[in-house]
């Protein structure tokens, strides 16, 4: 996976890299320390939740997410629960106040109760995501 050059060249990119190294990177000390979602074992693990919950890191994430989404012309930002929820909230909270971009999330299973079972905003169909 690569990072778009517009993000790597941003003045806040080096600081975000430092924060990710400090907050998310875990060296377990042995090759079988962590079992990954794929079932494979790894010595290393990235837990990005602390990055998303850190004030400075989340501000930089939001700035860079919005920069890239502006370049792409995205109308909406979101993804699969639970992982996409913090990033979606960061992106929406740091967007320009005049931004028309809206957030959404995709549930793994229907909630089965409540009024809007998908939590998606009206008009999302056919929009640029």
Describe each PLM feature range.
Residues 73-83:
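Short glycine-rich phosphate-binding loop at a beta-alpha junction
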Residues 88-129:
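Short, glycine/charge-rich flexible loops or terminal/linker lids adjacent to PRPP-binding catalytic cores
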Residues 2-72:
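Active-site-facing substrate-recognition patch
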Residues 53, 83-84, 111:
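Glycine-/small-residue-rich active-site loops that bind phosphorylated ligands and cofactors
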